[in-house]
Amino acid sequence: TLDVAIGGSINDRITNSTRIDSKNASLKYANVFNLANIVMSSSASIDQKIDAHYQLQSVFATAQIGYKEGVFLDLTARNDWSSTLAYTKYEKKGFFYPSVGVSFLPDKWVKMPEWVSFSKLRGAYSIVGNGVPPFITYPVSYVTAGGEILASDAAPFGEMKPEMTHSVELGMEWKFLQHRLGLNLTYYRTDTYEQFFKLPALAGDKYAYRYVNAGDILS
């Protein structure tokens, strides 16, 4: 048997935010956080206004191949284009991440004792990509109250790479005595690479911070 699915998606998100400095730091009613509930003073002002537009475009495909109802091969592939990776080499090509999984049902191929009701062996390898927050690859300035321009304190990182998580999973499942007793064992390992960090810049740098890709988290 062969089952195939192909698709695409667009995640488009627009954020408009306004920060108001009331000069009083108090609310009319406790724990009600909206502009109308702020106690304003005569010197209150709009401290900062930030607008952000984020878009993630994706294409993906899945396929499952089955053989004699006893062996199954599952394949997936996905490519994402994230607006937060603009001004990097991933702006045009995006980032690709696949997965492959195999499951085998021994009882479909080998005659099992009557007390064995079900048996399954499985294994999978996958890669999952993740973009970065906005305003990392390109510096952004904000206009504050009084017309002051607040520049970004971190250098643009044009070499930014998407975070990637590699996973391996092996397992088995057995059912005995007409499914009254079961055994399910799983081994998995995940490695996350290319995390991004905001680190203090060297003395004399025109920026206070710089971004780097680093790290390897194993679980």
Question: Where do the protein language model's features map onto the residues?
Answer:
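Extracellular/periplasmic, surface-exposed regions of secreted and cell-surface proteins
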Residues: 1-219
